Amino acid sequence: HEKRYSDTILTLSDTYEAGHSLFIVDEKKANDWMLHPDDDLWRGEKGLSNPCPCGYRLHTEKEWRALLSLGYEVKTSPEGFYYLSIADGQLLLPAAGLRNAYTGNFQHIGTRGYYWGANAISRGTSACIDFNKDDITTNISIFGFRAFGRSVRCVKDNQ
């Protein structure tokens, strides 16, 4: 779940409250961490499984697009890691990589960034933003399978 280096388990959850803090490995490639996916879990502050603290929520797809319209660039830190600079450095997103849903392994740490959005697109997928050092284009993707461990960026919920 929310702990970056948590141990793994091979059993998908029956409910949105998994009852443990283990990363659920989706060995059957259902593309979700739940047996019965729920597209409304992260909707705003009052979402059942909102990964953000009280009073905060994830960006919507529309909000991610608005941020990217301010201009962005993939840059390198002095330590050699990559990050996305939006609006001339007003927002920095580290290339934190992701946790592979099918193996539980970490991938692309320091070279690619993967951030969740609040919008469910279809069964097992949600909006997300992806960027990497090799491809200057940064995009909003509809192929964010919810079983993968991606970073979150929480924003104050003014709704």
Regions found by a protein language model. Name each.
Residues K3-R4, D14, I24-Q159:
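C-terminal, surface-exposed recognition/capping segments
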